[in-house]
Amino acid sequence: MAFTIAVAGKGGVGKTTTAGLLVRYLVENDLTPVLAVDADSNSNLNEVLGLELEATLGDAREEMKKGQSQGMTKDLFIEMRVNQCLVESKGFDLIAMGRPEGAGCYCAANHLLTDCMDKLAANYRYLVVDNEAGMEHISRVTTERVDLLLVISDPSRRSMTAAQRVQELAQDMKILDGPCYLILSMVRGEASPALLDAAKEMGLDLAGVIPDDESLAEWDLAGKPVSQLPADNPVVQAAYAIFDRVVPRE
């Protein structure tokens, strides 16, 4: 099975940017193939990676629930739609979970979807999951446990408290089968002693700091994929230094 890395944190803290840079890091270090999974209902990992997204697994789930399986058995229909949702690229592929569930029971669709995702993930060396702050969607992606959890936070107390909750939730759900690290993002200057002390008090193992960089926002506003930032960009360099320390070479 693939080595599963989940990236989580509340919105607006650089979570998806970090996930995109992680995919790029794995590809550049020949740790391929990689399956990137956008498990955030507000799907935009594709934009960070510079890919067009035409369909999501949420669409397939809705179609199956409404009986729109085109005369196929449900398992064959889900398998077909999963393959249609897969966006292929050099060294990695992307798939998005898409819209959240509507009203009614989705148990059958979710069960088939998880089985199909497990089969798909078996073809990859690494699985990178861009997750929402809540870890509920991880069970839709794989029945395997998470090998590495990276929790992203900005340097605010509120965001770090959310990061602490993510770590506790992962432990309570018993989905974590490896270490959990905190990555502080969008930090101006050096991380203050008070910030480092707060992380320690919350039981968060700090892996490193990614600086705040104006060129990141300018790059994004220009419509350029953040994952294609120049190699000498401070954000890229800081992220890669962290990945060098925490990502095992499977």
Residue spans for each PLM region:
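C-terminal alpha-helix
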Residues: 238-250
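C-terminal boundary of histidine-terminating zinc-finger modules
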Residues: 222-233
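Walker A/P-loop phosphate-binding motif and the immediately C-terminal alpha-helix
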Residues: 3-41
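Short, hinge-like loop/turn segments at secondary-structure boundaries
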Residues: 51-55, 169-170, 197-201, 225-227
